[in-house]
Amino acid sequence: MSATLTGSGTALGFSCSSKISKRVSSSPASNRCCIKMSVSVDEKKKSFSLQKSEEAFNAAKNLMPGGVNSPVRAFKSVGGQPVLIDSVKGSKMWDIDGNEYIDYVGSWGPAIIGHADDEVLAALAETMKKGTSFGAPCLLENVLAEMVISAVPSIEMVRFVNSGTEACMGVLRLARAFTNKEKFIKFEGCYHGHANAFLVKAGSGVATLGLPDSPGVPKAATSDTLTAPYNDLEAVEKLFAAHKGEISAVILEPVVGNSGFIPPTPEFINGLRQLTKDNGVLLIFDEVMTGFRLAYGGAQEYFGITPDLTTLGKIIGGGLPVGAYGGRRDIMEMVAPAGPMYQAGTLSGNPLAMTAGIHTLKRLKQAGTYEYLDKITKELTNGILEAGKKTGHPMCGGYISGMFGFFFAEGPVYNFADSKKSDTEKFGRFFRGMLEEGVYFAPSQFEAGFTSLAHTPEDIQLTIAAAERVLSRI
């Protein structure tokens, strides 16, 4: 079967290698036990109020553009009142009105072991006694670097930065420096941060707000950015032919999470590796989202494909600001001060981020981690799609390990153009309904969802039951 998002209540299966087939076929069967809710649905609806969030958000709009510090948080694409979060723990969040939510955003991916993990908090408290920022090398950088290098197949050396955007900026500059070529290929709907060169047919908040690009990006900054539809190897071949000898790299999300959840077809992901090798072009996996989430070694371990360079973020900081890029030693040795490609950062290698990352990765390395994520995410995704089928809503969706997504569309969804066929107005109604039920999904049809080790079977069952109620009334 092809690696697509399938409709009518069927979750994603992969067959691009025997390893992946075995992994999917051996996934634990879903356990549809009946869970008694401690608070009735009517009581929950009656008590649901966002008055304090509304007041605080109205004040915020006079202080910050749109009232937020990242656009998708403003709920513009889903409507309704943005919630202001007061605290988090495990799989739950509480807003300033006291409402509790089962959280499937996980701070947009980092909270894979659960929010405010006790061991991570204790380790951070110990590190903070020594200081919050050194602006100098520390042993914690060595520890996390060794963990990343031992885990991620493509990484022989790594450079820590402060965000996924920084990581992608650095890796593109490095690819251009190493190849002495300036053009690169990205895919429509893939998001690699908000640096000028990447804001062309981008996903994430750009897609959420329905923007083609962004004002303020000079044409010169994107003149060497080439784009192709995701999962379209022929389009890449045509770009290679049209710009022979001019392309430095191809960068992609190995599983798209910023146009919704879109996996690669086996033909595409394998063909892309061979095509870049044949043409002397560097292959870059942007694993800011998929790194340490699909498997301990990320998407490249999961698919059995080793890129030349990789970007990381989110999980490797355990919820603190972080990013990283790494790859082959001969390429990475071009980075200053070892080489001439300059990149620097005041807070890079921050001891708090290193500490949180170390303890998060230690937890993820424990036996059974990814089997558990696969089990609960399979049950969640299948349950939501089955609820859509029961209530007569065309839906499609899929999952890999602790990452999932669904669209209000027949499907299949192979690329950004397909994802935009989704009924975003219906998704908005679904999102708002689930919020009232105490379930927090990403406030955009064009963002993937995440499970964590803190999510319980009860969380999953309550979410599925809530989804069926909401879908029956929208």
Curated annotation (Swiss-Prot):
Q: Which PROSITE patterns match?
A: AA_TRANSFER_CLASS_3
Gene Ontology cellular component annotations, sorted alphabetically: apoplast; chloroplast; chloroplast envelope; chloroplast stroma; cytosol; plastid
Give the location in the cell.
Plastid, Chloroplast
Q: Which reaction does it catalyse?
A: (S)-4-amino-5-oxopentanoate = 5-aminolevulinate
Broad enzyme group: isomerase
Q: How does it assemble?
A: Homodimer.
Protein name (Swiss-Prot/TrEMBL) = Glutamate-1-semialdehyde 2,1-aminomutase 1, chloroplastic
Q: Which organism is it from?
A: Arabidopsis thaliana
The gene designation is GSA1
